Amino acid sequence: MAIQTDSFAAAPAPSSGSTRRLISAAPTSPNEEAMERALRPKLLQEYVGQAKAREQLEIFIGAARKRSEALDHVLLFGPPGLGKTTLSHIIAAELGVNLRQTSGPVLEKPKDLAAILTNLEANDVLFIDEIHRLSPVVEEILYPALEDYQIDIMIGEGPAARSIKLDLQPFTLVGATTRAGMLTNPLRDRFGIVARLEFYTPEELVRIVTRSAGLLNVPIDAEGALELACRSRGTPRIANRLLRRVRDYAEVKSDGRIVKRIAELALTMLDVDPRGFDVMDRKLLEAVIHRFDGGPVGLDNVAAAIGEDAGTIEDVIEPYLIQQGFLQRTPRGRIATLAAYRHLGVTPPRGGAGPVGSDLFEG
């Protein structure tokens, strides 16, 4: 099986400081992406978590392989860092076919996509990351390719221009997105297999951390792995990043073995608290509680209070706090919940705080 990544396969990463947070779910550097590839499971039996999606893919891939057909088109969606790219590689490996990888933002013209499609071999997998960012003109050429394995291309210019149909080899499109709601209905309807990836449990992350530690030749015990897992925000990418940073700490400050105490000391030094919150998370919660009496407060006021861009707060910092039940968005503004007061050790006002949020990692 060959894996080909186009030279234009990745859009430039934003340069905002918030994207370089240690607990960011997005890749922070090319070096990290290379490390992810080294740690990536190769087959479904090695893949941890996402039990429902994994079971469905096992069945659909097995059936396609049995019939020697292309797998139906697959849409993978969910928060960043949960394994969408990894699953695309696994799908190709399980099918025993080639993988061609690119991304939505860099397919600027129909000819960019046409060049890729016409070079696919029978039953190959085409992986398009950030597929919600495809331009409308590129998306239009994709429809007949997905349905009929054909594309229409224009030959010539001006009055002499004409359209011809080109037949394609049967192929499987695997699209990945963090924003399924931004997909157009015609594109979404062309995926026969749709899988939502969920946050991982601490138990699943312990297995991932333990496996990665083994591949990196890092000695780690069960309690050390659990400490990392609980601070990883339900995200394997973050778990593997924390593992590498704690490994550095253990090698310099101890005997190189990661145990609970070493993990606690390292992560405290790195400003990652027991809930996986960092300085920016706590700064936002403290601003809402101390400067605005727990809210409601508007986004622009919060942004001014903590010196951060409003878009970064809304897209990068807030989602996990809201998902974990520490912050609420209401029509009147942001409100800190009782869970936020308790986490910061602040006595909530009588009847003034939002409800206690549900906890992904309880139980």
From Swiss-Prot:
InterPro entries referenced in this protein's UniProt entry, alphabetically: AAA+_ATPase (IPR003593), AAA_lid_4 (IPR041445), DNA_helicase_Holl-junc_RuvB (IPR004605), P-loop_NTPase (IPR027417), RuvB-like_N (IPR008824), RuvB_C (IPR008823), WH-like_DNA-bd_sf (IPR036388), WH_DNA-bd_sf (IPR036390)
EC number, as in UniProt: 3.6.4.-
Cross-referenced CDD domains: AAA
Main location: cytoplasm
The keyword DNA repair is assigned to this record: yes
Task performed by this protein: The RuvA-RuvB-RuvC complex processes Holliday junction (HJ) DNA during genetic recombination and DNA repair, while the RuvA-RuvB complex plays an important role in the rescue of blocked DNA replication forks via replication fork reversal (RFR). RuvA specifically binds to HJ cruciform DNA, conferring on it an open structure. The RuvB hexamer acts as an ATP-dependent pump, pulling dsDNA into and through the RuvAB complex. RuvB forms 2 homohexamers on either side of HJ DNA bound by 1 or 2 RuvA tetramers; 4 subunits per hexamer contact DNA at a time.
UniProt similarity note: Belongs to the RuvB family.
Protein name: Holliday junction branch migration complex subunit RuvB
Organism field: Leptothrix cholodnii (strain ATCC 51168 / LMG 8142 / SP-6) (Leptothrix discophora (strain SP-6))
Annotated gene: ruvB
